[in-house]
């Protein structure tokens, strides 16, 4: 029996995003560009450790009480409490009324996993709606917990803009009380965010059907460089849904603190206004603790301590804000550089959507065929959907990338005419 025990296990394809990283690493060509994985790079194409993070690490190491002891099951309180403040805002009614539950998670993915486990236990029959397109891992996270997913229109490819009517129609047609996963800012993969006015329409529509909103907040500070501006959608949702349904928030510090490998994040839940919250809050917290205990026992401490220092030390907080502006402004600069090079080359099509988008990514509009040719002919690596990590561009490679895109677009434009 032991010889055949695993014979029926299916071989799965490599993860789409990490597969790109692997192929890029194996590519021996002298000139190559990785626009696949979502990680910030400086203008030399190197990983950047934020100055605020370096300073926080020094404080931690110089502390006489520094140790590697276990954290509690729900994480480091100085992280979770301060993380909640930057996403909800200290003036939020949810804070004033003690309606917020916060636990530490393994970055944003871990927070989404906690959400999925919670939904599967308490709301197993609710549909989970994801934007079309969405982050490649969203569907798997929810479906692996036995939840059913559906999609709502988001990206209008013809106009390279938000399909607001399709979005609102999907909200109205969804079964009452469904779960809508919303990207709070710097939408992945499109880089296209609703305007403030559009967010009001979206949240009002969600409230009218008693839906549950889950905000995936992976890029706070990356869309505009301003934490408060990037928290607008979450704060609006908490305000407008306060008497309708709880609001779930999955928060990551991978991007805005450069803590990719340390897996620092938080799961937050803003409860509705109701008299029973004095009993509901400890009950829900106990269930979240049980999920965490059975999965990871307790969350990792080192990265959590670093981010906590950023959030609770005024001079480090100030430097961190400057660091976020440094990253977001360089990405914006690269958006304009890429668009300008394409315009200068006369590349067929309109490329203004690149500068109209925000955050780390651009949904370029390139087809899977074009992306394949970019990789095979020019060693420029993108996700098959056409998503490009603008953070991978710099002064030394942006012109090369523009020329590669120009060649590929012209190749398929000419081929289509033959």
Swiss-Prot record:
<feature type="modified residue" description="N-acetylserine">
    <location>
        <position position="2"/>
    </location>
</feature>
<dbReference type="InterPro" id="IPR015422">
    <property type="entry name" value="PyrdxlP-dep_Trfase_small"/>
</dbReference>
<feature type="binding site">
    <location>
        <position position="135"/>
    </location>
    <ligand>
        <name>L-aspartate</name>
    </ligand>
</feature>
<dbReference type="GO" id="GO:0005829">
    <property type="term" value="C:cytosol"/>
</dbReference>
<keyword id="KW-0032">Aminotransferase</keyword>
<comment type="subunit">
    <text>Homodimer.</text>
</comment>
<dbReference type="InterPro" id="IPR015424">
    <property type="entry name" value="PyrdxlP-dep_Trfase"/>
</dbReference>
<dbReference type="InterPro" id="IPR004839">
    <property type="entry name" value="Aminotransferase_I/II_large"/>
</dbReference>
<dbReference type="GO" id="GO:0043023">
    <property type="term" value="F:ribosomal large subunit binding"/>
</dbReference>
<dbReference type="InterPro" id="IPR000796">
    <property type="entry name" value="Asp_trans"/>
</dbReference>
<keyword id="KW-0663">Pyridoxal phosphate</keyword>
<dbReference type="GO" id="GO:0005777">
    <property type="term" value="C:peroxisome"/>
</dbReference>
<dbReference type="GO" id="GO:0006532">
    <property type="term" value="P:aspartate biosynthetic process"/>
</dbReference>
<feature type="modified residue" description="N6-(pyridoxal phosphate)lysine">
    <location>
        <position position="255"/>
    </location>
</feature>
<keyword id="KW-0963">Cytoplasm</keyword>
<dbReference type="InterPro" id="IPR004838">
    <property type="entry name" value="NHTrfase_class1_PyrdxlP-BS"/>
</dbReference>
<comment type="function">
    <text>Plays a key role in amino acid metabolism.</text>
</comment>
<dbReference type="GO" id="GO:0004069">
    <property type="term" value="F:L-aspartate:2-oxoglutarate aminotransferase activity"/>
</dbReference>
<feature type="binding site">
    <location>
        <position position="38"/>
    </location>
    <ligand>
        <name>L-aspartate</name>
    </ligand>
</feature>
<dbReference type="GO" id="GO:0030170">
    <property type="term" value="F:pyridoxal phosphate binding"/>
</dbReference>
<feature type="binding site">
    <location>
        <position position="387"/>
    </location>
    <ligand>
        <name>L-aspartate</name>
    </ligand>
</feature>
<dbReference type="GO" id="GO:0006531">
    <property type="term" value="P:aspartate metabolic process"/>
</dbReference>
<feature type="binding site">
    <location>
        <position position="188"/>
    </location>
    <ligand>
        <name>L-aspartate</name>
    </ligand>
</feature>
<comment type="similarity">
    <text>Belongs to the class-I pyridoxal-phosphate-dependent aminotransferase family.</text>
</comment>
<dbReference type="InterPro" id="IPR015421">
    <property type="entry name" value="PyrdxlP-dep_Trfase_major"/>
</dbReference>
<dbReference type="GO" id="GO:0006536">
    <property type="term" value="P:glutamate metabolic process"/>
</dbReference>
<dbReference type="Pfam" id="PF00155">
    <property type="entry name" value="Aminotran_1_2"/>
</dbReference>
<keyword id="KW-0576">Peroxisome</keyword>
<feature type="modified residue" description="Phosphoserine">
    <location>
        <position position="389"/>
    </location>
</feature>
<keyword id="KW-0007">Acetylation</keyword>
<dbReference type="GO" id="GO:0006103">
    <property type="term" value="P:2-oxoglutarate metabolic process"/>
</dbReference>
<dbReference type="GO" id="GO:0032938">
    <property type="term" value="P:negative regulation of translation in response to oxidative stress"/>
</dbReference>
<keyword id="KW-0808">Transferase</keyword>
<keyword id="KW-0597">Phosphoprotein</keyword>
<protein>
    <recommendedName>
        <fullName>Aspartate aminotransferase, cytoplasmic</fullName>
        <ecNumber>2.6.1.1</ecNumber>
    </recommendedName>
</protein>
